[in-house]
Amino acid sequence: MSKIVIITDAWTPQVNGVVVCIQQTVKHLRKMGHDVFVIGPDRFKNIPCPTYPEIRLALFARKKVFAILDDLKPDALHVNTEGPLGIAARSYAHKNKMRYTTAFQTRFPEYIKARTAIPLSWTYAFLRWFHKNSERVLVPSKTVQEDLIKWNVGKPEVWSLGVDLSTFQPKKRAARKKKVYVCTSRLAIEKNLDAFLSLKLDGEKWMIGSGPEEKRLREKYPDVKF
């Protein structure tokens, strides 16, 4: 079987969708018999990411990333994020003429634009550079794939995400008279949660999650169950 290395700037102890996706991918790849290694910021000196302190950014990562990959000699390399570790791994792959895949799981340009005056065109230009030589850019949905095609970013391929049926069982339903509309998300500005919370619906709205926007959203939407 193959030796697979996944390098990511988003990793434990962070709790977010990217981390969960990697954890599930690693679990299933190992069940298939592959040797899987994850390189995250916990192996490096790191600092909190501005505006999102749960994310840790590795410092001076290039030399150590090169040494780790030289030691592991992976058969396959997946660069999951566009941060310092991702840039270092991308550089390693180019230097060693190694094929690799990348992923786009966070709307990075929209996230930056929501917090700064940096236009989308600038960050999408960075993404075009970052992903242009990857074999495939793995994306979570057809919508994201279409967006990357529109911006001419790499070769996007849908990486459909499954549901853990040991936890979520839609056949077991609570007896409720009212309809319930549920949104699960980190409560942050780039998630555009007002679009859901402001809808006029024939039932209750439940918001599941936490984050920096929680106080504002609770005050603005007192009828929503958080």
Regions picked out by a protein language model, each given a short descriptive name:
Residues R99-T101, E110-W129, V139, L165:
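Nucleotide-sugar donor phosphate/pyrophosphate-binding loop at the beta->alpha transition
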